[in-house]
Amino acid sequence: MLEDKAVVVFSGGQDSTTCLFWAKERYRSLHAVIFDYGQRHKEEIQCAVDIANEQGVPYKVFDMGLLNQLTANALTRENISVQAGEAGESPSTFVAGRNHLFLSFAAVYAREMGAKHIITGVCETDFSGYPDCRDVFVKSLNVTLNLAMDEQFVIHTPLMWLNKKETWALADKMGQLEYIRAKTLTCYEGIRGDGCGTCPSCQLRQNGLDLYLREKAGAGQ
């Protein structure tokens, strides 16, 4: 039986698009929230809008430009290069407070829409330097939001314990692997589909896809 309403935190990337399809199988009414936080590549926002339109999912684009004023990182500043974190430090692509703020604003929107369910694509496999992708953070924020608004929100994280190979497997199970591969934007250089192939995000995505396709081919023999 399908649940009533849900809100998806949506970026047009592999993970959030996988979650969008996951949510479409479970909710009668679905809304996507897209955040413009001053990211270097506006193509990300357009990609999310295009996918939402193609899938018939109503969406809102919210201006979160203040976040760009508060914190400097490689996703919003041209003069900061993409670098992995060293010695326990966060990578240059970490946007401090992003998931905290996005989920908080998504909850406010969900309340106005009469929705109790909020879906996000964060996962522990992304934790390396990204503290706001941890399960403990999401559960803590879920409690805080319910106390703050006297609501009964449930934040769903379908990918929390999946690696990239398993995320591709989920996409394939839903019949959306090729769509997600071709239409989404994960690349730090702002290139849709398989991307530039060299940035850390593209490499993580491609390695997961290669592992899944090899495993699938082996199982079919």
From Swiss-Prot:
**Binding locations of ATP:** 10-20
Gene Ontology BP annotations? queuosine biosynthetic process
What the record notes about the co-factor is:
Binds 1 zinc ion per subunit.
Q: What does this protein do?
A: Catalyzes the ATP-dependent conversion of 7-carboxy-7-deazaguanine (CDG) to 7-cyano-7-deazaguanine (preQ(0)).
Please give the name of this protein: 7-cyano-7-deazaguanine synthase
Q: Which reaction does it catalyse?
A: 7-carboxy-7-deazaguanine + NH4(+) + ATP = 7-cyano-7-deazaguanine + ADP + phosphate + H2O + H(+)
Native organism: Shouchella clausii (strain KSM-K16) (Alkalihalobacillus clausii)
Q: Which gene encodes it?
A: queC
Keyword annotations from UniProtKB, A to Z: ATP-binding, Ligase, Metal-binding, Nucleotide-binding, Queuosine biosynthesis, Zinc
Q: Which GO terms describe its molecular function?
A: ATP binding; ligase activity, forming carbon-nitrogen bonds; zinc ion binding
Q: Which family does it belong to?
A: Belongs to the QueC family.
Pfam families tied to this protein: QueC
